[in-house]
Amino acid sequence: FNTDVLMALHRKQNLSPLLQAVKEHRVVNPRGTEPFNVKSMFEVMTGSFKDRFHQEIVQRTPWTRQFYQRQTEGPDGETISDLIEWTRGHWNDLVLKPERGYSGHGVRVGVVNNDIEEAINLALSEGDYIVQEKIPLALWAEEIPYLNNEQIHIKQYQTDFRCLMGNTGLVGFVGRYGGVPTNVGSGGGFQPLAILGSDMSVRDAVVRVNDTIMNMDPGELLDVIAHQKNMAMDCDFTYLLGPVKIALRPRLITAGQIEALENYGEKLWADCLTLENLWLSGQLDDLIRIEEEELEIARMNPWQGSAAIIASDGLFGFGAEPLE
């Protein structure tokens, strides 16, 4: 959890032993990752500092700006004289979200949330929001079977895919599916991962797997779902009151795509070190809006490339999105 959550708990429960562990560098992730782990850092990577980062990382990062009345540069390099008015006029292509948050709380998405005035008022009243270029929802949409009233159906879900990087390289992935946003706290679930070993395309493989599931006996599929729930409970794979939802079809990726993601992860890790250096040198002071108490904790435990897990859902597709 973020350091602001840590401090809120500390004020209620006295977590001095945990803070001492932070000071002694016994916590993963180091709290020093926090200042450059906020969503406003996407502005650094798509703004005036973008030449400091790998071109691939910049290209796979959506245009982002801290949201308040200001002049700035738009997604295509155009001058924006008033960001709030510009957001109002381009809402269908944008997203507003808190700089720090989880479970999709406070996120507003153009088209999905049509009331632009409510979205803008929320962002301005809460403060510390970003406005971000909306990624075409179809890029991460997948058709996945589901069971309802003992009948099998196909539904188009939104998915996301996160690479997990450590100091030794790429260490794993997390796939989620659901609505918009896909956060588990907003009713989403997890999608397992399978590596496609044949020469067929990802889309053809997805169609074949979906067809196979659609032709199953609903009773057999009920047994599969029950088995998923039991495994989730046995492994403490739960959220709040019960087992996390698990998709009936895995996300399919190829060995070549994994190799490309390993390369992406190496570059991202290096660029995170660049972000930390920019923060430590004071060059990001105008962008990082964190209370001084939290910054003191971050300074207790600088990262500097030590053991950590960094998650990223950069802009990449895998070929499973539905054809228009």
Each predicted region: which residue ranges?
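Preference for protein termini
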Residues: 1-324
